[in-house]
């Protein structure tokens, strides 16, 4: 019986946020760069999460559609569960700029795109690590 209860607790902790008691829609994980155990960030409401970072960006920088969003996030793209990749994917999509995108393993194209966007006066957001 104890094993069944322990398994139920594990399932519940993986499925429901312990603070809000809501079902988890997405679990993001840390990159583990600190050398410790990879941490988890459970999100119970993806719409709220997305609205939060979209409004935060708009508050400080303005409309995302005014920007070309370029991303160079190699180690983040190569693993699952990155909240940064999730946010940047959304920003790329919402920007609707044809040059917005990830520039993985193509630094030459990234450089040429940056030069062309600068020459045209296009507002550009480069996100990289």
Q: How should each PLM-predicted stretch be described?
A:
Residues 1-29, 35-71, 93, 99, ...:
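Nucleotide 5′-phosphate-binding alpha/beta core
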Residues 75-86:
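Conserved coil-to-alpha-helix start sites within the AMP-binding
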Residues 30-33, 84, 126:
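Conserved S/T- and glycine-rich ATP-binding loop of Class I adenylate-forming
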Residues 86-96:
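Ligand-binding cleft/hinge of the Venus flytrap
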Residues 72-73, 127-129:
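Short His-Asn-centered micro-motif
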């Amino acid at each position: 019986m104890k094993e069944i209860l322990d398994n139920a607790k594990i399932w519940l902790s993986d499925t429901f946020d312990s603070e809000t008691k809501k079902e988890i829609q997405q679990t993001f994980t840390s990159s583990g760069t600190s050398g410790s155990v990879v941490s988890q960030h459970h999100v119970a409401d993806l719409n709220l999460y997305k609205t939060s970072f979209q409004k935060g960006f708009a508050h400080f920088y303005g409309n995302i559609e005014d920007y070309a969003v370029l991303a160079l996030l190699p180690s983040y793209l190569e693993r699952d569960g990155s909240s940064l990749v999730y946010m940047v994917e959304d920003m790329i999509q919402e920007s609707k700029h044809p040059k917005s995108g990830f520039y993985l393993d193509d630094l030459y194209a990234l450089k040429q795109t940056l030069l062309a966007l600068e020459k045209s006066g296009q507002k550009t957001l480069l996100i990289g690590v």
